[in-house]
From Swiss-Prot:
This is DNA-directed RNA polymerase subunit beta'. Belongs to the RNA polymerase beta' chain family. Pfam families: RNA_pol_Rpb1_1, RNA_pol_Rpb1_2, RNA_pol_Rpb1_3, RNA_pol_Rpb1_4, RNA_pol_Rpb1_5. Residues 1361-1396 are annotated as: Disordered. Its cofactor is Mg(2+); Zn(2+). Gene3D superfamilies: 1.10.132.30, 1.10.150.390, 1.10.1790.20, 1.10.40.90, 2.40.40.20, 2.40.50.100, RNA polymerase II, clamp domain, RNA polymerase Rpb1, domain 3. It comes from the Bacteria. It comes from Syntrophotalea carbinolica (strain DSM 2380 / NBRC 103641 / GraBd1). One of its GO terms (cellular component) is DNA-directed RNA polymerase complex. The RNAP catalytic core consists of 2 alpha, 1 beta, 1 beta' and 1 omega subunit. When a sigma factor is associated with the core the holoenzyme is formed, which can initiate transcription. CDD domains: RNAP_beta'_C, RNAP_beta'_N. The keyword Transferase applies. Mg(2+) binds at D460, D462, D464. Binds 1 Mg(2+) ion per subunit.
Amino acid sequence: MEDIFSLFERPKDPLSFNAIRLSLVSPEKIRERSFGEVKKPETINYRTFKPERDGLFCAKIFGPTKDYECNCGKYKRMKHRGIVCEKCGVEVIPSKVRRERLGHIDLACPVAHIWFLKSLPSRIATLLDMTLKEVERVLYFEAYLVLDAGDTPLFRGQLLTEDKYAETMEEYAGQFVATMGAEAIRDFLLSIDIEELSTVLRKEMSEAASEAKRKKVAKRLKVVEAFKFSGNRPEWLILETIPVLPPELRPLVPLDGGRFATSDLNDLYRRVINRNNRLKRLMELRAPEVIIRNEKRMLQEAVDALFDNGRRGRAITGPNKRPLKSLSDMLKGKGGRFRQNLLGKRVDYSGRSVIVVGPELKLHQCGLPKKMALELFKPFIYNKLEERGFCTTIKSAKKMVEKEKSEVWDVLEEVIKEHPVMLNRAPTLHRLGIQAFEPVLIEGKAIQLHPLVCTAFNADFDGDQMAVHLPLSIESQIETRVLMMSTNNILSPAHGKPIIVPSQDMILGLYYMTRERAFARGEGKILSSRDELRMAYDAGEIDLQAKIKVRMSPALGEPETLVETTTGRVLLRDVVPEVIPFDYINVVMAKKHVANLIDVCFRLAGNKETVLLADKLKDTGYRFSTMAGISICLDDMVIPESKDVLMKAAVEEVTEIQKQYTEGLITDGERYNKVIDIWAKCTEDIAQTMLDTLSKDEIVSPEGEAVKVPSFNSIHMMADSGARGSAQQIRQLAGMRGLMAKPSGEIIETPITANFREGLTVLQYFISTHGARKGLADTALKTANSGYLTRRLVDVAQDAIITEQDCDSLDGIVMTALTEGGEVIERLGDRILGRTALEDVLDPVTGEVLVEANQQIDETLVEKIENAGIEKVKIRSVLTCQSQRGICATCYGRDLARGHLVNLGEAVGVIAAQSIGEPGTQLTMRTFHIGGTASRRAEQTSLEARFDGFVKYLNLNSVLDAEGFHVVMNRNAEIAVVDETGRERERYGVVYGARLRINPDAPVQAGSLLAEWDPYTMPILTEIAGTVRFGDILEGVSMEEQVDEVTGLSRKVVIESKGADKRPRITLKDSEGKTAKLPNGAPARYMLPVGAIIVASEDETVSGGAILAKIPRETTKTKDITGGLPRVAELFEARKPKEYAIISEIDGVVSFGKDSKGKRKVHVTPEVGSPKEYLIPKGKHISVHEGDHIKAGEALMDGSSNPHDILRVLGEKELAKYLVDEVQEVYRLQGVKINDKHIEVIVRQMLRRVRIKEPGNTRFLADDQVERWEFECENRKVVGEGGAPAVGEPLMLGITKASLSTESFISAASFQETTKVLTQAAIEGKIDYLRGLKENVIMGRLIPAGTGISKYRSAHLLIEEPEEIEEPVPEDLEDETAGADSAQAASEESVAEGKD
């Protein structure tokens, strides 16, 4: 028996490898690995279909076409294994070797490898210190290359044209060597001594006079060093032999009708072989040089096309005019090897079908159609049928299953028991797009899905399809159950709040049952217990919504008291675990309350209870929403009576504004802005009154008087409960549709005054179509953009894995509450929840330690911190984590989806990327629901106090204007309101030019006006009184009178002047006609930027605080994540904004210098040290004033910040803070929650590298970009040897750049620019240590995350032997249980890890 098995080849063990190296291959190596030379272009014989000898499919070279059978048929079958047939020369072995045996073609003349020639920067050209053009001229036989100049005036490496060569030849025949073509280049490369060249170049670099020269040398040195370290030889860049791909990988398949389908590679190889053979023949015939040269050029082109078709010249096309797919094209792009076959594979044991709702399922179940289950579980069924003795062979089992006998169904029931399946809905934007369920067999052909998981899948039942996958091995089943079961994914990994929350009908039902109805039956009754209440309700004595009192315990362990509540809420109490206080249920349950209830349940009662609660809430919700019988009818849309009044008022206001404009008091831009504001406000007011009308009903009480009570209007209940619809949409149904946007994004100033109930006129309908169509078009575009952003994020963060428990970092970041305009947007507690404290957090009053250093901040600690009134907390952060590779658990903090400290091996980078990318797509798909109505907040024009107290001015300079108000004269001024004890209650920034309504230290009441300003223009104010004189304000040169077409009035606008010397300005003269002095001694001159509208007129006398000119701000466009998505991409790509503000690098005092070349000079003078000078382009408004004290990092002009400047001036933490805040701003605008730490992970990946400024004694070169840990390692090594360390500066790379410059070339090549990455890797002889996730997936290994982390891979189990030996276990069972044990142990270990 043993002997039989020896005949069959055992499958070779997949080679265990832990790194992969890419390098150039020498011609000898190619020949050594080849199994023979391909000499003929023939493929197969068209009659016999057998491969031609020495052709592209030759059986002698590549192996037999049929298993164990030679080509001529002399030897057949296994018994002749390993014999080489003497007749046809074919070895008798399995035919699968045709997938792995290489052939080769010996070229008659060398050719250059196109990758190293044309992939920029050209490596061959760099190495030879020539330009690419020059190298190409030599290669394509247009010029001679001097290899040895001898005693001639030529020099080595010079190019000679034909004529010049002939001339020189006449004069110095035989004294010099010059050739052309790839031979010339190869000989030149052969003569290079890499070691020597490296030394020479390093010397040249240190002596380089100019920066340009140094850069050029450095570029060349980089390539030389790569050769030096990798052991590659430069002449290998020129090919003398080319390998031929195994034939099975470039198949030739007969189609019916005698035609063949073939891989393009065969055509390309055939071309090479034909030209090569022709060249050989011509050389034998001693053909004229011209013909041979032409043939060599053609051979070069053929080889180029084989490696990378279309890279040089026109692409070679096939018979159907389509470019042939070369070897490079096989790797590149979405359809290439990397992305199509290695990163995304199709798998067996899977099926897909339409989904329908399964409301009676439990949360961990899904309904699987019997037909699908039968097909998916086939092998398991065969196994069980045999085990049960229903049949004896697999074949008979197969028959039984095909006939669908009754036993088969019984077995199927048993097989699927507790065998989880995975459901997936495309697009899978985050990890909750694939979850595991236990299947329940159902009739029909559609998969049933539990309604509560729809949010996570973003699924609905309008025809969506889902795929089912079956985990086979016991380990995969355990992982599926422990990690992916829907019941283990209650919290969202993006923000840590529950994602399994009832929605729509369920919410409506819960809302309906917890509402109060005035004067309902049984109101005011007092019941002795919950049981009595239930009896009374069942008997119909009390209504569901009656207000009653019940004696019950308000929370676990508290004594019973009378609680005022309603019937429905007490019924709901029975559903909710007793641990949860009744206060959480004793409210009207809208969507946010239900979400909060599930969150609290998870924290107090644990996972299992939460799952049960979710299911109970689902059932209760459906039951009561059915009983409520809520529907929609036309009369539910109540149009408020005051609509006409409000509309009239708005029309009057608009007419008034129009009149002001006609009289020339305001500009057209201001008029437009004000009109838009009036209508926006009018729409808001109508919406408000409509909502008030909807939310209150007037009913007659038993006493006979009319009372207003909360309404049971269906539409109002749907929106109020958060089940469906929003105030926005109701506004359009019953209020007014409001302002619409044009496709360009501007707002049309005539609003749609009608609503849908009244119906739209033709014009109104036409205006509406813009928005609706734009919504749909945007959606299509943005989905693609968002997907691409996610892909780049995943790629940059894929190797951010939790690798150690604690890196012992002593650094962290300071967290404060996030405020905007004095309003707290995000509380400090929300921002530090689940993070680790860096140092002890002390109570500011008692000094008691609230949180110890390195302790995780959970909900209870957050409460303590907030109650103590602490303003800022230092926490550990991913940004300051000191782990060399990956991130440590302590710096990362809580795993948001599990609610405890993150486990080792968690792939936090991918989770971060998904959390940021997923809402991007969500949001982009959500624009059109409101139907394109322009949502635009009326601009803030004033500040009101929120608390009573006293006003304090902080850092505020002001002057009194003609009306006696203080006018703010500086930027970053602030007003604070403090209470009697002097504690600050609120603080607001006030803009330059704001008029303050309250004097310092004056008392204010909440709601009183503090300051007001014009939001649409930025004023240029005078600080002192004086007479206005214009300077360089010449009509038609630097200023033009723009006549308004409508009003006929003109205004003076500053324009860009042609001459560089014109500087439009306003000067103030004193009574003696001299230039007045400002309080700080500077002359009173005000420069006017381009676009400013001059308000003052020449020789006018003005008082302090008067407006001299106004700079109009952009008219507002609607905010929408379109602005958002590109903004997020721009931030993560670290792009410089188009018009970025120049920022000061030091603290100091501002002064202005002389102008130069149309730029203005701003000097910043520090208290100690030398002043810095900045040049600001003319026509830009400078936002600082002479004598201002400014801090490092403050902008000197208008514009957005350039992140690279922030990094340079303020350092990494400030940069990270800026990026996190800016990204969050975009998402917050859309109401999307993302935890800061996800953005921090991405920012950490962007800041991984350092740019070398001074190389010291290290192996780095100046301007090299190296990984930070590599930089630190090398420095430690050099300092240890007593050398000088390198000096570097932190570098921020955008996510695309960062992905391409990762250590792993496999990961980079599969991302973008495949050829470029592989070219570079080959020259450097790069080694990929397979540390990230992507490279391991591509190489077909387990990923080094989760249970695949090395710590678990190398773990061994010690099983204690029991004392007495019981009955022996049958062998096969033993294996299975052992496997289960080890997997179970591994998963338990990972769970245990998290707990301690």
